[in-house]
Amino acid sequence: MNKKIIYCDGTFDLFHSGHIQFLKSCKEMGDYLIVGVISDENVLSYKRTPILSLENRVTILQHIDFVDEVVANCSFQPLSKDFLEEKKIDVVVYASEDGQPHWTDHYQEAIKKNIMKFIAYGKDNLSTSKIIEKIKHI
């Protein structure tokens, strides 16, 4: 039996329950979950410096029992056809507040292959940015 392989990527900074909800949603779509962790340098190209180091973020994800594989130092360049084929990825998942397509340039190959799924954040709509804003106002 072939396993259905799911891929998602993100910064996963200040890991919180919203991340868990997202990863569980991804895992429920298939049998094997690969999580890419965007490198610090690449994160800087679209938002602030991560609070936690790449090593810390990867370690957290490696200790989640339903995450099957963690790919460290992912580039936020477009996902390549080679990467999708090498990992035999069946579905690529991206979550946003509204569940609408964002970062479509990054996911162009997955969109072309019709394996892209955009979903909304979990029920608590929690994000690292919201946590940081809350801390600033304490």
Where in the sequence are the language-model features?
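Nucleotidyltransferase catalytic core that binds NTPs
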Residues: 1-138
